A protein has these predicted regions:
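Active-site-adjacent structural elements that line small-molecule/cofactor binding pockets in enzymes
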Residues: 1-144
Length: 144
């Protein structure tokens, strides 16, 4: 994708992806294209982020996120890349922080190094979704 995002006429021949000269537009507004985030949770994430990605985007499901972030930073440094420019985003829902702990959990995630929290809104009727969006909006105002 980065070839396509950054070159007027892109061509790439790799192990898994192979394409002849091609053009694609419009190009992303952000120079170099948007960051590529690894959206997975496995033992291979640190190596794959270090080799291919600009950051990590897990679901906050009670896993050892602190350990994973440290492993990613270590692997990125081992590959000679700056660990200070990584993008750590996380996806969460109200159900993952029960008992009114959502604000505290967001604070915990920020302390771990996440720079973006995205909220999942379950598929439902608008009259069920709007109260959830209102709660998220009120919460977001506390952090901006």
């Amino acid at each position: 994708m980065k070839e396509i995002w950054t070159k007027a006429l892109a061509e790439y021949h790799g192990k898994f992806v192979n394409f002849e000269p091609t053009w694609c537009g419009p190009k992303p507004a952000q120079a170099g294209g948007p960051p590529v985030l690894m959206g997975a949770q496995s033992k291979w994430v640190p190596q794959r982020v270090a080799e291919y990605c600009d950051g990590w985007f897990p679901v906050d499901a009670g896993d050892d996120l602190a350990g994973s972030i440290e492993a990613i930073r270590s692997e990125v440094a081992r590959h000679g890349r700056s660990k200070d420019v990584l993008d750590f985003s996380v996806l969460m829902t109200e159900q993952l922080a029960p008992g009114g702990r959502l604000e505290a959990r967001i604070q915990d995630l920020i302390k771990l190094g996440f720079n973006r929290v995205l909220f999942l809104v379950s598929a439902a009727r608008p009259d069920e979704q709007l109260p959830v969006l209102d709660r998220y909006a009120a919460l977001i105002r506390k952090f901006v």
